[in-house]
Amino acid sequence: MKLCRHTKVLWSCTAAFALLLAGAAVQPTMAQSTSKAAAADTERQQQMVDGPQRSADNRARDRYRNPGPVLAFFEVTPQSRVVEILPGRAGYWTEIVAPLVKDGGYYLAAIPKPNPDRPELMKAIAEFKAKLAADPASFGRVATVDFSADGADIVAPGSADFVLSFRNLHNWMAAGKAEQVLAAFHRALRSGGMLGIEEHRGRTDQPHDPAAKTGYVREDYARAMIEAAGFRFVAKCEVNANPKDTKDYPAGVWTLPPTYRLEDQDREKYAAIGESDRFVMKFVKP
């Protein structure tokens, strides 16, 4: 069973998600009211996961990315003010989170700073913006902000409820910019705001690589680095664990789907492994 570890309890991320969707009965107390609200939020999250605004390619990755349980774990609600860091041209999480919060909160996409010398980057930015502009009924008015790893403010300090980053930490480590980026996240969040992090999990039987050259990051190192930036660890979720991932590939984590950096070489073998073993953690700004 895939588990989510909280600071004081161990519970099943998928089981808790299913329980909320089922609207399990409890005694009529304040806890019941809270449970009902959480169940309603989770139901709305799942409606966005199942919604017609999502592309077929993104849906095909759900078995690896488990968007419903991850959002329930992060506790993103329709009223949340969410900043997603580097959502990518496909907008996997954009397709879910932007519709979820468009009426009661906001979704801001922190996208790469344009660079005319990088035509592929410029194409990706244009495709992402075109995707949003093509369906305002689903996505609402999504704001974008240019993001770089130099530690500049992303939004007005203290204005975000959530900063979410999926599979990005290794890039900032490789550039020697992780500390600056985490400091910017800390400034962006209000007191009590949450930082949600997903990253390819490195092996603990090998030395930590501060440059994350293979794309994998040791979980213990990531947690320590984020805590050093002023965050308090809240919980971890194991819904995206993958025991098939041996993390010893010729082209690092990019050997696996969806990248397949080796192209057709041993493609069936890597497809059978699936997407990487990943940790999912949440931290609060005190």
Would you name each region that the model predicts?
Residues D153-V163:
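A short acidic, Gly/Pro-enriched loop at the edge of an enzyme's catalytic core
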Residues R44-F73, T77-P78, I96:
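Class I SAM-dependent methyltransferase Rossmann-like catalytic core
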Residues P78-R89:
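Conserved class I S-adenosyl-L-methionine
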Residues E268-P286:
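C-terminal lobe and adjacent flexible extensions of AdoMet/dcAdoMet transferase-like proteins
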Residues Y107-A110, G192-H200:
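Conserved beta-strand signature within the Rossmann-like core of class I S-adenosyl-L-methionine
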Residues A149, N171-A184:
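A short, conserved alpha-helix within the catalytic core of class I
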Residues V82, V163-L164:
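Hydrophobic beta-strand segment of the Class I
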Residues A98-P99, A178-S191:
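A short glycine-rich, Lys/Arg-flanked "PGG" loop and its adjoining helix->strand segment in the class I
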